[in-house]
Amino acid sequence: CNGDGINNADMILTLNYFGIDTSYTRKFEQEIRAAHPDSVIIKDATHSLLSDDVYDDTYDYVFASIRKWSGLSGGVILKSSPDIEPLTRLNMDYEKTVHEAMSAKKEYIRDGKGSKERFLSLYNKAEEMLDSDPAGYGISKNAKEQFRYFDLDRVAGSRKSNCQILADNQDIWRMKGIEPVCADLSEGDIPLFFPVIFRSKDHRDKGVGKEGAEGAGQALP
């Protein structure tokens, strides 16, 4: 596909899933730009945030949520022309719920206190708050300060190496009825997820566990 099927579009939104095959996605987006020079192209770079060449001149706006990469309560990296003023209003109910979930998860993992159900329930409650409220909110002071010390290179290296371990053991996955979507990683790709296809729901539940993946058919690196 080269974008020829897009007609009279004032605005085009593109995104790459999982952070894999990003070079193919970029080629597709460049073809769209060539075919639609006057359209506004917005790129959601959340999944490909740490991959190569995410922020070039093909796009008018690029945004990427840092929540999925960092575990912080909020925050977005934005490249735009002209500049967009950052939002300052905070959703305090959301911030409170996320921090309760973080504390409950930490106590469960570190001290064995509480339950997995409690912190998962709190995280789900926080996500529902965002889904039900389309208004935009700014990053909290605490999250902004923490992100200043967030080691992007370390995270990128860990994601890449962990995903490669999963890819290198694909024969074991197939024995369990799980087919990796990407058998090989491109040089510039830093994956957010390691996507897989399950032969059946039973294979998913037995191979990963009902709560072992963030979503059906996905396993985290």
List PLM regions with ranges.
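PLP-dependent aminotransferase class I/II
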Residues: 13, 88-221
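Active-site phosphate-binding strand-loop segment of PLP-dependent enzymes
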Residues: 2-86
